Structure formats: structure tokens, C-alpha cells
């Protein structure tokens, strides 16, 4: 996941979590090693113009995408409230970076090992119920997290944008792997997205599509390294 860049150094920062064979191989690379291809960014740039007060909600590795969005918002003079969620403290990323661009910063962990115990929706609900008003909520993370963030913000009538990260192959819309239903219409995350109005996305369909290759992923993961057994 692309998290940052340095135009002067000509570098891009990516953050990944080992979840399968591909990320396991990526984790073996050392300084000076290379990968065959690196493609991006894809789709349409995130819209941040004109926003004065935004709540950015990030979950897990999705925080790597949420950070540059929060950074861009802060640079434009927007007031940024950030909520990040992780399973445990061990998986926490980009804390100093988020604090540097956030007017308010909240950490939630499933096990309570850091920040407050609970879900990002718990923190967001408290803010909304306390009377906080936002031009927009931007949620980036696991599909189930974004689904429930959108369900919550819909209760309060707050516009919510999400960043979709479905399976992609060619990145041009030709393969159709990243297609989604948004507002009853077919969209492609790689060319029309990745940002969409969360209240218009068919999350159930998106979650079903995400599991299409799970058997093949499990097989490849097992073949790569038996250290993954039981994980």
C-alpha cells in the first residue's frame, strides 16, 4: 500500500502486512533489491478541495492510505480529526505521522492494548453524538469496517467517502476483477475509483467478490512456506 512519497529523493514509501505468499516474498527483499513492476497511482485523485472539517477513519493497513489523505487535507488548511483502529498495539503504524497532521487523534484497539478498547465506530459515534459536525467522513480500511462506518454516518446524515481496494489485475478496467456496484451502476475501482460515496456502495457484493480466490490464495500460501500452517 502506497503511504507516502518524496519527490526530491524520487522515492515511494509502501507499507504491507504479511498475509499470504506474495507479501511473504516481498518481506524477504533487502535494500538494493528490486521488483519487476510498480504501477500507480490508479484511478481518480482523492477530492479534498473545499473541505473545512473532516474526520478520517482508518483501519489496519488501510491507515497507510488514510495518512496521505489526512496529510493533504491538513496542508490545505482543513481541520482533521483522525480515528485509527488496529487489532493490537503490535500492529500500530504511522502514529507520529498522523499526530503531525491531525487536530484530534484517537486510537482504538480490539484488545485494549493501546488507546481505547473498541472499534473505530465506537469513537466515531461518540464524536457524532457529542455534536461534532463534519463536511465529510473519509473511511479507509477493511470492507466490513467501512460498511459499518457508512451505516453509522448515514444515521447522522454525514457524507462519507471510502477507498475501495478490491482485487486488481491489469489496472485499466479490462479484466473486470475490480468491478463494484455503486448507486446501482457498475464501476471499476481501478479507473472510476478508488474513492466512492460509501452510502451508494453495495458492500455485500464487494465482500463476496473479495473471497472469490480464497481457495487459490490458501493453496499458494501453503505451498510457499509451511511456517504459515495454523496461522
Where are these regions (language model features)?
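Residues in well-ordered beta-strands of folded domains
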Residues: 3, 15, 36-38, 191
Amino acid at each position: 500500500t502506497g503511504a507516502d512519497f518524496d519527490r526530491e529523493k524520487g522515492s515511494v514509501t509502501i507499507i504491507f502486512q504479511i498475509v499470504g505468499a506474495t507479501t511473504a516474498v516481498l518481506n524477504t527483499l533487502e535494500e538494493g533489491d528490486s521488483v519487476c513492476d510498480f504501477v500507480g497511482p490508479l484511478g481518480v485523485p482523492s477530492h479534498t478541495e473545499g473541505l473545512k472539517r473532516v474526520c478520517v477513519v482508518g483501519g489496519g493497513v488501510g491507515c497507510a492510505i488514510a495518512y496521505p489523505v489526512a496529510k493533504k487535507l491538513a496542508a490545505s488548511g482543513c481541520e482533521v480529526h483522525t480515528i485509527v483502529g488496529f487489532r493490537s498495539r503490535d500492529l500500530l503504524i504511522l502514529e507520529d505521522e498522523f499526530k503531525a497532521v491531525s487536530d484530534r487523534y484517537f486510537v482504538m484497539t480490539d484488545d485494549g492494548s493501546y488507546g481505547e478498547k473498541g472499534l473505530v465506530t465506537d469513537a466515531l459515534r461518540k464524536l457524532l453524538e457529542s455534536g461534532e459536525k463534519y463536511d465529510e467522513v473519509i473511511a479507509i480500511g477493511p470492507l466490513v469496517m467501512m460498511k459499518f462506518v457508512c451505516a453509522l454516518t448515514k444515521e447522522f446524515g454525514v457524507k462519507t467517502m471510502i477507498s475501495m481496494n478490491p482485487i486488481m489485475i491489469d489496472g485499466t478496467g479490462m479484466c473486470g476483477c475490480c468491478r463494484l456496484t455503486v448507486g446501482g451502476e457498475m464501476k471499476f475501482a481501478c479507473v472510476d475509483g478508488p474513492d466512492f460515496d460509501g452510502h451508494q456502495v453495495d458492500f455485500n457484493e464487494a465482500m463476496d467478490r473479495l473471497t472469490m480466490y480464497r481457495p487459490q490464495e490458501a493453496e499458494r500460501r501453503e505451498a510457499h512456506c509451511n511456517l504459515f500452517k495454523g496461522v
